[in-house]
């Protein structure tokens, strides 16, 4: 029994390592060849694994790409704070934390930036599903935390968040793909990014009054 348990544990570890190698291969190809390079044979070759594992572990190329997209997305990895953190201010501090964390996360994650751009130019099921999952996560946070606080003005708060989050996406992508200066602020410098962070905090404070 003990030997069987060790064998099963080893098999599980090998499976997870292989899955991670395939995910890493997707990332490497995205960085070198772009989305057009994501072909089954190329992914398997880059990972140094049999292409059958792509089907065994992910159901195929699309399933692997979907898993990679979810692993990179900020909102797919946000846990519901209602289950772990006491919310006593209508979600004001939580809103600040999420916006500031996202501003930092998107800036540092070039792969997520590519996924965000990909979602704007291609009608792909996995990207549509990702957008739907983001909306579901957002709905849980809005309905459970901020809607009760804002009451009749709940939609106004959601509109403010839509502007701030989309602004974060644009500024972070702009900073890493074009000149880093926007409205006279160097978005790659600590000073410039601090100004944006302070602006986000200021706008949340004003929204909550």
Model feature map: region roles:
Residues 65-72, 130:
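Alpha-helical DNA-contacting segments of helix-turn-helix folds
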Residues 21, 29-63, 67-68:
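Helix-turn-helix
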């Amino acid at each position: 029994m003990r030997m069987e348990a060790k064998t099963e544990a080893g098999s599980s570890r090998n499976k997870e390592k292989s899955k991670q190698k395939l995910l890493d291969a997707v990332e490497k190809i995205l960085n070198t060849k772009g989305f057009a390079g994501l072909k089954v044979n190329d992914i398997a070759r880059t990972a140094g694994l049999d292409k059958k594992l792509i089907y065994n572990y992910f159901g195929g190329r699309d399933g692997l790409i979907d898993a990679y997209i979810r692993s990179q997305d900020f909102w797919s990895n946000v846990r519901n704070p209602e289950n772990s953190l006491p919310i006593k201010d209508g979600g004001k501090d939580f809103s600040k934390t999420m916006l500031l964390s996202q501003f930092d996360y998107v800036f540092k994650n070039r792969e997520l930036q590519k996924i965000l751009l990909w979602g704007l130019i291609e009608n792909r099921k996995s990207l549509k599903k990702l957008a739907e999952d983001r909306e579901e996560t957002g709905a849980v946070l809005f309905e459970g935390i901020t809607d009760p606080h804002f009451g009749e003005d709940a939609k106004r708060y959601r509109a403010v968040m839509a502007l701030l989050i989309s602004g974060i996406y644009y500024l972070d992508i702009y900073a890493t793909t074009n000149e880093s200066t926007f409205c006279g602020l160097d978005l790659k410098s600590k000073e410039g990014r601090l100004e944006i962070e302070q602006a986000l905090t200021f706008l949340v404070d004003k929204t909550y009054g």
